[in-house]
């Protein structure tokens, strides 16, 4: 499909919505047909391209193989569509990560203190502990209850980007079972 003489040449471009028909019994399949919907997400913004690569790698490493999930496909499609009509926003990436965790059943509980299973208090700060949840903590880098409510509601514009990124990375790392994401190290080298 990559060779210029192939009848599929040009159809398999990154972030383009296509329907593939393939056959084969092993993991290496034979491509039989491509039906492209002509939805082209050719946003060449370096940050959005990195985000696409990161999301694709994340999905490959976190999902079991060969199990279709319509809700996850719709989530992915909405993420890709968001960058075809606007510029890159880190909040969109964080929303995708949080929504992905929810769809996979690893969603974060933003309502209770995991140590004593009580409701969060307004005057307390909370630290996220992977596989456990939020716990009361006096560290300045932690979230207030008001911030956690905003994150739960996906109102991320006023949330500190570094704290939010640390939160999603910790939650996702717990789901990856020690698998590294190469796209993160690649982006660090580029920036």
Q: Each predicted region: which residue ranges?
A:
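Non-catalytic alpha-helical scaffolds and adjoining flexible linkers that form interface surfaces
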Residues: 1-191
């Amino acid at each position: 499909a990559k060779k210029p003489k192939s009848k599929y040449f040009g159809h398999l471009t990154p972030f383009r919505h296509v329907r593939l028909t393939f056959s084969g019994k092993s993991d290496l399949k034979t491509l039989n047909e491509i039906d492209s919907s002509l939805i082209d997400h050719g946003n060449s913004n370096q940050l959005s391209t990195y985000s696409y690569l990161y999301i694709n790698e994340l999905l490959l490493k976190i999902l079991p193989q060969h199990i279709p999930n319509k809700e996850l496909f719709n989530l992915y499609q909405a993420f890709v569509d968001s960058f075809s009509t606007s510029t890159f926003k880190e909040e969109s990436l964080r929303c995708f990560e949080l929504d992905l965790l929810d769809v996979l059943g690893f969603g974060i509980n933003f309502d209770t203190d995991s140590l004593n299973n009580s409701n969060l208090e307004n005057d307390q700060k909370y630290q996220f502990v992977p596989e456990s949840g939020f716990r009361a903590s006096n560290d300045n880098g932690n979230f207030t209850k008001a911030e956690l409510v905003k994150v739960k509601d996906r109102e991320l514009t006023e949330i500190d980007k570094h704290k939010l990124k640390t939160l999603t990375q910790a939650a996702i790392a717990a789901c990856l079972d020690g698998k590294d994401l190469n796209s993160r190290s690649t982006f660090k080298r580029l920036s």
